[in-house]
Structures are given as structure tokens and as C-alpha cells.
């Protein structure tokens, strides 16, 4: 019974400001409890359950703020469990709503940087939307996204490992010509041991399909793969990272210079995204944890 009263109390507290919010009488009727019983329950001294609930709210708010207000209720719930807390994801959802904790939201507009090179030769799609891999360095994806600064556009190129979802290569510059993506893939090659048949997948942008970049990949022993023109799903993993960095960092930060943008994005990638941000596709682990688990298995073998 007390759970129903707690639900009514929480719902009324979070919706009473709205003109169309249900009344206490309506909610009591829906849940099959009496109005008098609800108010009698509400007037009792604070119970141990209520104290635990308030403590849980404090923990949830602390986790939400510690993670830069990026997490929805599922990630907050997983972070709570990892820290030894106990609560259902639905309880976390309800308490976050009561506390008014809303994660940062994406903006609808997106500028495309894909400019197809009409002179590019045929390059196969070796990935076919399968963004999984058995070991780090086997399959990688990359893309470029833009970052506004007071000095004009900055451009971020990334390389993501499909096995760990870790950003293993990145570069920021004031243009998105081929040297930008070359820097990113060279960093990636330094950060992981590439498989003998390693694949790098991208869209059909003119820089990715250029002869200059093809020569770089060939020199690193990497097979090239590209998706179809105009299909974001063919490079969905890279697009997903772009959305995350935009929502969680770029859209919430003002960059006076390209240098400041580079420094801030570097911190996000190396300290936040790779090492502390829980990834749903990894069972709510971090990319670095998955990478380290692979290395530990290799050492034990």
C-alpha cells in the first residue's frame, strides 16, 4: 500500500504545477486506495523507507551531476549499481523525474560534410553495417564532424575501434582536407596492434576516397571500406559518436579559439568517453574497461 501512496505523492509533486495534472482524488481512484488513507500516510513521521528514498535521491542527483548531466535514467541506474547501490531502473526513472533531472538533448539540425569524389574508383563495402569485431585493431570506422568556434569552423576526425568502441585516433584542424584524416588514422595505428586483415570503414567523402588517403591505408596494411552515398546507417557507429560528442560537449561549450576546442575535445575523448562514460552496447562498461579485459585475457592465454 505504501508504494502506491509514495507513487501518488511523487506524481503529484512533479505534475501539480501543470494545469492538466491529475488530482490526488483521481490518482487514488485509479490505484484503488482511499484519499483519507493517503493523507493519513502522508502525516506520519518519516519512515525508514522514506529516509532511504531521500538518500537514494541524493545519490542519483550526485551521479547525474558527476556525469555532466549526460546520463538518462538507464545509465544513472547502471552507475548506481556499479557503486553498490540498490534500486530498480523504474525507481531511478521516477526519482529523476521528481528531481527534474533531464539529460542534455540533441539538436535537430545537422550539417553534412560528405562531398563525393566523382573521380574515385570503386571501393567495396567490407562492413555491410556489421560494426562488431572479435579483437581490437580488426575493424575500425571513421568520420568527420564540425565544431563551431569564434575563429570559424573546426573539424574533428575520429577513428573508432569496433571491438571496444574506443576512440583510438582523432585530430582537430581548421579544415577537413586529407591530412586531417591521415593524422587520425596514424594515431589509431600507434594506439592498437592492427590485425593482418584490418579494415577501416568510412563514408564516400572525397578525402576518404582520395588516392592520397588510399596510399596511407595501404602503407599501414589496412583494407579500405566505404558505405553507400547518402546513407548514414552505413557508418552508424561513427555517426553515433558524432552525436554523443555534439550533445555532451560541443553544444554545451563556447570555444573562443580552435586551440581551445581541440583541448576540450581531447579531454572529452581521452578522459570522459574512453574511460568513464558507460556504453550501453558494451553492457554499460567503458571502452577502456573492454580494451583492458581483452589485454588481460591475452596475457593469461
Across the structure, where does each feature detected by a protein language model lie?
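Charged DNA-binding/catalytic regions of mobile-element recombinases
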Residues: 1-301
Amino acid at each position: 500500500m505504501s508504494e502506491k501512496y509514495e507513487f501518488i505523492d511523487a506524481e503529484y509533486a512533479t505534475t501539480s504545477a501543470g494545469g492538466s495534472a491529475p488530482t490526488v482524488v483521481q490518482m487514488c481512484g485509479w490505484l484503488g486506495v482511499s484519499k483519507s488513507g493517503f493523507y493519513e500516510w502522508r502525516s506520519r513521521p518519516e519512515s525508514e523507507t522514506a529516509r532511504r528514498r531521500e538518500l537514494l535521491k541524493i545519490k542519483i542527483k550526485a551521479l547525474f551531476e558527476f556525469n555532466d548531466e549526460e546520463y538518462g535514467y538507464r545509465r544513472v541506474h547502471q552507475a548506481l549499481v556499479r557503486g553498490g547501490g540498490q534500486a530498480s531502473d523504474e525507481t531511478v526513472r521516477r526519482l529523476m523525474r521528481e528531481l527534474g533531472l533531464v539529460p542534455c538533448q540533441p539538436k535537430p539540425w545537422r550539417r553534412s560534410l560528405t562531398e563525393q569524389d566523382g573521380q574515385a574508383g570503386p571501393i567495396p563495402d567490407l562492413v555491410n553495417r556489421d560494426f562488431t569485431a572479435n579483437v581490437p585493431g580488426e575493424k575500425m570506422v571513421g568520420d568527420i564532424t564540425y565544431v563551431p568556434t569564434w575563429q570559424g569552423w573546426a573539424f574533428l576526425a575520429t577513428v573508432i575501434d569496433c571491438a571496444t568502441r574506443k576512440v583510438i585516433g582523432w585530430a582537430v584542424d581548421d579544415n577537413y582536407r586529407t591530412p586531417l584524416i591521415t593524422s587520425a588514422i596514424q594515431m589509431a595505428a600507434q594506439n592498437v596492434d592492427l590485425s593482418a586483415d584490418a579494415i577501416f570503414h568510412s563514408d564516400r567523402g572525397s578525402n576518404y576516397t582520395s588516392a592520397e588517403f588510399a596510399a596511407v591505408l595501404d602503407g599501414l596494411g589496412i583494407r579500405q571500406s566505404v558505405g553507400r552515398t547518402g546513407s548514414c546507417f552505413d557508418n552508424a557507429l561513427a555517426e553515433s559518436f558524432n552525436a554523443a560528442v555534439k550533445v555532451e560537449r560541443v553544444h554545451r561549450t563556447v570555444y573562443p579559439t580552435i586551440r581551445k576546442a581541440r583541448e576540450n575535445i581531447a579531454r572529452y575523448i581521452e578522459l570522459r568517453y574512453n574511460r568513464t562514460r558507460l556504453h550501453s552496447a558494451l553492457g554499460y562498461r567503458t571502452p577502456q574497461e573492454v580494451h583492458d579485459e581483452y589485454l588481460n585475457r591475452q596475457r593469461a592465454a
